[in-house]
Amino acid sequence: MNSAVNESAIIRSVRETLARAERKEREIPRPAVTLSYAQSLDGCISANKGRPTAISGNQSILITHQLRAMHNAILVGINTVLVDDPSLTVRHVDGENPIPVVLDSQLRTPPHAKLLQQIEKQVIIATLPGASYERESKLVKAGARVIRIPEAGGGGILLTELFRWLREQNVNSLMIEGGAKVISSVLAESLGDQLVLTIAPKFFGRSGVRAVETLNCVRPTSRPCLTDVEYERIGDDMLVWGRLVLDNAVAADG
């Protein structure tokens, strides 16, 4: 891949939105959040549960690495780590690696995971207060920093508290790449500022893993939607960008 990448209109929109979101005063402090992932035409982020799936084309992958270079930190869920074993670094383009953050309520991250092999940025693993201290010790020896975050009401890690903690660590911008549970939670809790969605010309069918699961929205009569939407063809893929807002005009189901 060629590291000389021209900045697209969508990348410029992302940069401008990050700058505004970082300055925004919030009731609960958090970083500016960019939700970014790739899906098939039928809304799947994987062809089969538990198996890695190549979705984006080469040109779209370059965009993903540009986005990584624009953020202080990058977050994924434990299933993404176990299935894809990502490094979460910036490659193919110039830029600094973001701080890797993993949501791992049971500390299942393998000490030999690729993201723990990069020494430039220490990996942050967010877990629950009751997680195994023996597993924590192994991950700390592997180079990770383990932090314990309160549990959310419906289970899992309380994202608002994690994001507050990240902001206190001077993480001003956070890119979220998945997986499905993380994507759904960020949308349901209105914790994102913008979405960068890559749509590949593929179908995965019934066996595919949906990008968005049930949206248990904090405000039941509102749903997340995009505004100021932009579209751009990148190779055979379609890139969609927009600011994430709540559509307060949406009526309750039924």
Where are these regions (language model features)?
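Enzymes that bind and transform nitrogen-containing heteroaromatic metabolites
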Residues: M1-G254
